[in-house]
A protein has these predicted regions:
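Transmembrane helix-loop-helix hairpins at the membrane interface
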Residues: 1-115
Length: 115
């Protein structure tokens, strides 16, 4: 998740999808559409869960997570445009995943030092 997901996601979102959208829309509109798609796809991480009655949207965390993912996607898109390369976006995406994974790990780590 820290390395391979960012490679695939950046190739798809900032590479293929962004370019395809730019053939039809302005750069600004294309970037917004691509970032909104990124946010929507990532709702499954913290905004949507599978309950007994099917998929459920978590009313508190879903909007926060969606906005965070759209903002992070804008950072990745800016890095891609500024550098004219996917590598900085991939590196930033990998760093973001590492930090998020570390935060989740530390939050779930037992409070006591006994194992």
């Amino acid at each position: 998740a820290i390395l391979f997901s960012p490679i695939g996601e950046e190739i798809f979102f900032r590479g293929m999808l962004q370019r395809a959208l730019e053939e039809r829309f302005s750069v600004r509109t294309s970037t917004w559409l691509e970032c909104l798609a990124f946010g929507f796809v990532h709702l499954c991480h913290h905004g949507v869960v599978l309950g007994a009655s099917g998929l459920m949207l978590l009313p508190r965390s879903a909007p926060i997570w969606f906005v965070l993912m759209v903002l992070v996607a804008h950072l990745f898109a800016w890095l891609r445009k500024r550098s004219e390369s996917l590598y900085p976006a991939i590196a930033a995406h990998a760093a973001f995943n590492f930090v998020m994974g570390t935060c989740i790990f530390l939050a779930l780590w037992p409070a006591s030092s006994e194992l």
